[in-house]
């Protein structure tokens, strides 16, 4: 862990801690892919001398709030807030959690992850559609694998495999820690050295070498589920570090960013075709990803009407540049979003740790915001022409299954 970029925020009475590990779904092999989900739910069992939920109890008794964890394709995060005079407690507990992982409740937590998959994917229309969509779009790259895994993987991984996985990746060399609040920088550095310096390093994060081959034609899938229809439309685009990434972010805001955006005005306000129209780049940032549109029609309107509107507005951007008013609106949105993210200690900590973990540079997030503000109309047109063609497109539609034929007797 690097302590060279510690800055106090003296207006905060509590400290927000985020620990982000450079390992996400892309670090996982097919067999070990779901271990990180169980590991993050086993925090309260990872101390040899602890009873059930002991870590949670200690933190709560010392005033901790907002204890949570998240995991994605690129990284795994742990975060909570502590009173400023309890900051040392984080170093004590986190270092012991890494040094002495005892996964006492592994098998019960395995059932928790299975249930999480059932709730978020197998019985949730959007989750099911999203999983099939990513599998269709990514034939080679691990971004096509579900973050929560598949049931057969979850059911067959044992505690020994989890222990080995933990030792491989949960080391100080893979951790980025952001501490924001009324802190003493010298104390933070001293505690980091005292509690983490003698912990063995884990296996260093290695980039994924598999590259998704160019798509050679539109891909379409129908996902049958008894729910209201919706559609995902995706185009392969570069990673968040590519020079075009910021222009693509601005294009997204022009089309779906807020009530005054083009597609929202057309589909939701004017024509009343859809309840939802959104766009986003995912499922990660480190590698080439998907620029995705999500649309949910209002009956009796159809997903095809949403598709038509999306394609027409993309084509319009290639012919007609966005107006100065649209670009200024996007700049205002970028600035407002940046202010909101930095309004709390947690927001600052999460943003800094995420930027350092992914890009090895905690200032990158601020440079990205500045770059978005410099995007021109010509930049937006250029990326609209470069990426949004039919051959680069994957479309996944949620459809109701056909009703079974009814028989009769004469």
Residue ranges, per PLM feature:
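Non-catalytic beta-strand/loop surface segments
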Residues: 3-85, 119-172, 198-242, 253-302, ...
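Solvent-exposed, non-transmembrane alpha-helical starts
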Residues: 88-90, 107, 123, 190, ...
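A common structural junction motif
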Residues: 96-103, 195-203, 311-322
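Short beta-strands and strand-coil junctions in structured, solvent-facing domains, enriched
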Residues: 100, 185-186, 238-242, 300-303, ...
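Extracytoplasmic/secreted cell-surface and envelope-processing proteins
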Residues: 185-189, 243, 303-305, 393, ...
């Amino acid at each position: 862990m690097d302590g060279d970029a510690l800055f106090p925020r003296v207006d905060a009475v509590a400290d927000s801690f985020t620990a982000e590990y450079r390992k996400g779904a892309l670090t996982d092999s097919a067999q070990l892919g779901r271990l990180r989900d169980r590991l993050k739910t086993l925090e309260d069992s990872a101390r040899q001398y602890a009873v059930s939920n002991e870590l949670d109890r200690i933190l709560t008794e010392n005033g901790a709030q907002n204890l949570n964890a998240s995991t994605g394709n690129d990284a795994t995060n742990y975060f909570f807030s502590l009173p400023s005079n309890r900051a040392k407690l984080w170093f004590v507990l986190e270092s012991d959690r890494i040094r002495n992982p005892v996964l006492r409740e592994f098998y019960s937590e395995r059932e928790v992850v299975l249930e999480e998959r059932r709730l978020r994917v197998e019985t949730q229309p959007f989750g099911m559609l999203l999983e099939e969509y990513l599998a269709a779009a990514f034939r080679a790259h691990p971004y096509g694998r579900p973050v929560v895994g598949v049931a057969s993987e979850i059911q067959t991984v044992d505690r020994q495999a989890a222990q080995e996985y933990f030792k491989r990746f949960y080391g100080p060399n893979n951790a980025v820690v952001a501490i924001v609040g009324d802190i003493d920088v010298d104390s933070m550095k001293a505690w980091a050295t005292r509690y983490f310096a003698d912990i063995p390093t884990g296996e260093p994060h290695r980039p994924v070498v598999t590259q998704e081959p160019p798509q050679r034609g539109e891909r379409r899938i129908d996902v049958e589920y008894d729910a209201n229809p919706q559609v995902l439309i995706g185009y392969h685009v570069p990673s968040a570090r590519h020079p075009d990434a910021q222009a693509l972010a601005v294009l997204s805001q022009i089309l779906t960013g807020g009530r005054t955006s083009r597609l929202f005005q057309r589909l939701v306000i004017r024509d009343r075709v859809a309840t939802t129209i959104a766009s986003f780049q995912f499922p990660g940032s480190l590698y080439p990803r998907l620029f995705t549109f999500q649309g949910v029609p209002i009956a009796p309107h159809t997903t095809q009407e949403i598709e038509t509107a999306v394609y027409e507005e993309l084509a319009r951007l290639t012919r007609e540049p966005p107006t100065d008013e649209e670009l200024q609106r996007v700049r205002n949105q970028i600035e407002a979003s940046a202010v909101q993210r930095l309004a709390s200690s947690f927001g600052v900590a999460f943003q800094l740790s995420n930027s350092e973990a992914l890009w090895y540079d905690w200032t990158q997030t601020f440079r990205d915001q500045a770059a978005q503000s410099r995007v021109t109309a010509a930049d937006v047109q250029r990326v609209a022409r470069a990426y949004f063609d039919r051959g680069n497109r994957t479309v996944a539609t949620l459809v109701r299954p056909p009703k079974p034929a009814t028989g009769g007797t004469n």
